[in-house]
A protein has these predicted regions:
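Active-site-lining helix/loop region of Rossmann-like oxidoreductase modules
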Residues: 1-129
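C-terminal active-site/capping subdomain that shapes the small-molecule cofactor and substrate pocket
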Residues: 93-198
Length: 198
């Protein structure tokens, strides 16, 4: 997500961010992948579905809980995403709300983002900025899907559209293989980009 937002943040400061992540089972390690595989076999064979890694069955299900709960009702994963986003983009005042959901996908996290900016950014401006970003981000006319974004370093961004409820808002969809394109390499590329464009 930050890979997609970094070039937009250069055009105008982000004041508010609302995001929902759809995180693959590989985010829980190889054990998470094995649990999904085993559950799919159990379902196909008509057996009782067992689980150890996730709080409930993940096959044919989604679980809106990643990490443990904080006193504010957000999970540790959600708070990490909020805090890291502010830090990476150098926007400590940015308001962020997010929900992190585990989905029955092997690889590649997906995220729906609504970003609100100080100044209006057109879809054309956003598309051009993301397309010219040198951080392995691909602006897609097709719909990015985890099935096709896995096992590569690119982060795919699509469905860029103006918000219907925020005058200076944009809504977009991102997919990327978090195993190949992890948070650390993203952060380094974003910091390098922001430093070079000060």
């Amino acid at each position: 997500t930050m890979m997609a937002l970094a070039p937009l943040a250069r055009i105008s400061k982000i004041t508010k961010l609302v995001a929902s992540t759809y995180q693959a089972v590989s985010g829980a390690g190889i054990e998470g992948q094995h649990e999904l595989e085993n559950q799919m076999v159990q379902i196909a064979e008509g057996k009782e579905v067992t689980h150890k890694v996730f709080r409930d069955q993940i096959a044919c299900n989604v679980i809106a809980e990643i990490g443990s709960y904080n006193d504010n009702g957000f999970t540790t994963e959600e708070m990490k995403m909020q805090n890291e986003g502010r830090k990476i983009l150098h926007m400590p005042e940015m308001k962020v709300d997010c929900t992190c959901v585990r989905v029955p996908v092997m690889r590649s996290h997906s995220i729906s983002v609504q970003a609100v900016f100080e100044e209006k950014i057109s879809v054309e401006q956003a598309t051009a900025a993301i397309a010219s970003f040198t951080g392995d981000v691909m602006c897609e006319t097709e719909l990015p899907m985890p099935l096709y974004t896995s096992n590569q370093d690119l982060v795919y961004v699509g469905r860029i559209r103006p918000s219907l409820i925020e005058e200076n808002g944009l809504v977009l969809w991102c997919c990327g293989d978090q195993v190949r394109k992890g948070a650390a390499s993203n952060a380094v590329q974003i910091i390098e980009y922001l430093e070079a464009h000060r």
